[in-house]
Amino acid sequence: MSPPLELDYIGLSPPPPPPSSSSAAAARADDVDLKGTELRLGLPGSESPDRRPAAIAAAAATATTLELLPAKGAKRVFPDEAALTPPTAAAGKGKAAREGEEVGAEEEDKKVAAPPQPAAKAQVVGWPPIRSYRKNTMATNQIKSNKEDVDAKQGQGFLYVKVSMDGAPYLRKVDLKTYKNYKDMSLGLEKMFIGFSTGKEGAENQKDGEYVLTYEDKDGDWMLVGDVPWEMFTDSCRRLRIMKGSDAIGLAPRAGEKSKNRN
């Protein structure tokens, strides 16, 4: 830089000598340097007198091409499969994915909203309270015991049977196994009841006031005693009845037919 000029504001000192040509050239060079370092709007150095036009054009071209080229290491916007997948398939996949997400969200909401249900308690029935499974067990055992009793009675030929007589105000119960045949049973019943006979002979030769011994078999039919073998009678007899001879008419033929069918 040139040395500062001394100015005579009062007018006492003589005027300064004119600057030489060398000092003027140095001053112009300083002005050029200052102008190059000034702050301006625009590209740096675009107005610098020392910058060549070719360099300016190259810088401008580089600036425009940088915007079009991707950054180093950046990924492509779409994968290679996107170019090969048709738009409809891509749209379908996107819709299915959205629906799956919505369904999953709804299930999660239901799980959160619905509280866990308490365990169901066994039903209490009866008094005192008996739980249902115990009731079922008791019913099963009762049915089983009843079935065993029936089987035992059938196997033993209903050992004890009730004996009734028309006009008698009471019933009796006898054990058929204590008798060996019809005659023994008839003698035993005569001690309990009087005035009856057994078999077809008693039904055919009946008189007023005579009684006939009948029985009820497994099928619920009433038959005359003495029409079937003793063993068959003891196995099928359920009940004995001493009825009047007039009421026993018609039982003998049925008993004979049934005996033939069994044989």
UniProtKB/Swiss-Prot annotation:
> What PANTHER family has UniProt attached to this entry?
AUXIN-RESPONSIVE PROTEIN IAA17, AUXIN-RESPONSIVE PROTEIN IAA3
Q: Where is the composition biased (Basic and acidic residues)?
A: 28-38
Record bears the keyword Repressor: yes
List the GO biological process terms. Answer: auxin-activated signaling pathway; regulation of DNA-templated transcription; response to auxin
Return the SUPFAM superfamilies for the record: CAD & PB1 domains
Q: Does the keyword Protease apply?
A: no
What is this protein's function per UniProt? Aux/IAA proteins are short-lived transcriptional factors that function as repressors of early auxin response genes at low auxin concentrations.
Give the record's subunit note: Homodimers and heterodimers.
A Pfam family that the UniProt record links to this protein: AUX_IAA
GO cellular component, alphabetical, reads:
nucleus
Where the record places motif EAR-like (transcriptional repression) is 39-43
Induction of synthesis? Not induced by auxin.
Q: Which UniProt keywords apply?
A: Auxin signaling pathway, Nucleus, Repressor, Transcription, Transcription regulation
Listed name of the protein: Auxin-responsive protein IAA3
Q: Where is this region: Disordered?
A: 1-54, 76-121
Q: Which InterPro entries match?
A: AUX/IAA_dom, AUX_IAA, PB1-like
Q: In which tissues does this protein get expressed?
A: Highly expressed in flowers. Expressed in roots and shoots.
Q: Which residues form the PB1 domain?
A: 158-245
Localisation per UniProt entry: Nucleus
By sequence similarity, the record places it as follows: Belongs to the Aux/IAA family.
